[in-house]
Amino acid sequence: FYPEGFRLAEERYNHPDAGRHLNPSLLNKKRWQGESIIGKTLWVHAEQGLGDTVMCARYFPLLRKTGAKIIYECQSAAIPLLKNEFPWLELVSIESGAVANYSFDCWIGVMSLPHVFCHAADNIPGQSAYLSVSQEATNYWQHRVNELSPGRRFRVGVAWSGNPIHRADRRRSIKFEKIFPYLQKVNGVSFFVLQTNVPDECERVAINLSDELLTLDDTGALITQMDLVITVDTSIVHIAGALGKKTWLLLPYRYEWRWGLEGETNHW
């Protein structure tokens, strides 16, 4: 059902208000839909959240094979992490609003890459680690984690909530007071917070370094120091999966269709 789902997702461009959600600089350019673009310049723009940016990064090596110059406009927090793996990719911050200053032949929304490249569930690229963190971030976070959790304690990274302005946040996030008793009961484990917006009482049961997580490179480097990640459906699950870290995903009864219909593991 993945190819059909992503095909239907393309209907967003047929909505009467579709143009309102696009940068005006894109409206007079052709939207790329998979045709040959050898020798041309393709502008790719991020859509939705940081998790979607990370999820779709698995398609960047396929973009490179098109023979086009690729420019990716994405969230500034994602740039250091993407730069590690894709030094050939020109990265532009969405926050800079610089699209009007660039020359390109065609464009595509990053969430259209699965439609262009995904023809079956078993050929989704990046089903093992497809991103890496910088050595600088790795060294820093290895030192911080060893400093705060000495010895060989089992280390678990946790995230119980996502961006509160997400339209489905009420269904995906868990109130901290709901998980607090469970964290209290576990012995011999060091819990590390992987999210922001952390209540004060969290520090009674987990190590909170959220103020130091400035970019996804920081978050990813902290994740690499964990033995396990437990998270709700937010960017953390995509980062952990992209780094090849063992992850338990907490899903609501009615969950995002991309996670599939059955089984204990997932292609993403």
Name what the model sees in each region.
Residues 1-228, 233-268:
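Alpha-helical solenoid repeat scaffolds of the TPR/TPR-like class and their adjacent stem/linker regions
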